[in-house]
Amino acid sequence: MKILFIISGSIAIKKCGEIFEFLSSKNISIDCIVTKNAKKMINLKKLKKTISGKIYSDVDEKNNKMLHIDLTRKNNLVIVCPATSNIIAKYSNGIADDLASTTLMASNKNIFFIPAMNSEMWNNKINQKNVSNLKNLGIQFIGPEYGKLSCGEVGLGRLMNTRTITNLIIQNVNKTQIFKDKKCL
């Protein structure tokens, strides 16, 4: 099983390592796309140690114009974690202006968004409309949850507990594996 993670620029990025380590221990191969803003917040050397696949960014697409297509074809599942209001809005509105958003637009695989943002951003009417649009299209959301946010405030917007995230991903992987190599009429 191969999963493509799209990492966007949220402070919750620090929890991705736990998720990757657990999934890697279950022999799940992970590739990552790191957005421009995420690159400012994450240690790429540490990230590389927690995944078995490759790390991609906008720079890589300059050498391979089909990279967004190739990534969706070789992975079984696409997960955006942490998902910011920016990447949610881009996908909801069909904006494809970087590797992360063009890959989402090119994907025909199951897509999960795992949001993390301040409550004010999560509850914003435009953000909620975008989330609703995506859910109506069959995009799945894991979280967010209510609790203490990175900024110190308490509210809805915190990244879901990493154990819950990994359990839900494993459940989806198991569902996908049931139908692997099967032909349905």
What is the predicted role of each segment?
Residues 184-185:
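N-terminal nucleotide-binding beta1-loop-alpha1 segment
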Residues 1-112, 118-181:
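A cross-family phosphate/adenosyl-ligand binding-site feature
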